[in-house]
A protein has these predicted regions:
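Beta-lactam-recognizing serine transpeptidase/beta-lactamase-like catalytic domain environment
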Residues: 2-147
Length: 147
């Protein structure tokens, strides 16, 4: 959902944009594969990609977010993904009054980071806050325990 938000906001995609899932993403060497490979989802838009969990769609958006003047730039892609994950509170602790690890945003591979698979690390409560922000139109709340 972070990548979908980034792609939509940055104008990389629109709600009607379709991307052809070719199974394996070949814009980079040793490109990752969609979970459905050797099959594919075919031509798919962002709503369908979220519904079907189409890795290829989000690899392409992550790749496009990484482009600077027509050239793939991994550092720029990481910055873009982290910019949008921060908007969902994935750059800070939740505020809960128990021991909590500081979240770790990605530092590499924006293509696989676009589906949440990289060197990032989040606790379950941090992911809960992220999903809550998605569910309530983007408001990120600090968590607290009630007695």
């Amino acid at each position: 959902m972070v990548t979908a938000s980034a792609g939509l906001t940055e104008g990389i995609i629109s709600p009607g944009t379709t991307i052809l899932d070719k199974g394996q993403f070949e814009e980079v060497a040793n490109g990752p594969k969609c979970w459905i490979y050797p099959s594919s989802h075919g031509s798919i838009n962002v709503s369908e990609a979220l519904r079907d969990s189409c890795n290829y769609f989000f690899y392409k958006v992550g790749y496009d977010l990484s482009m600077v003047n027509g050239t793939y730039n991994e550092d720029h892609g990481v910055e873009m993904i982290n910019k949008y994950s921060s908007m969902y509170g994935l750059d800070s602790k939740t505020g809960i009054e128990i021991a909590e690890s500081k979240p770790k945003q990605t530092t590499e591979f924006p293509i696989t980071s676009a589906i949440g698979q990289s060197n990032n690390s989040f606790t379950t409560v941090q992911l809960s806050r992220y999903v809550t922000a998605v569910a309530n139109s983007g408001t990120v709340y600090n968590y607290t325990l009630l007695k």
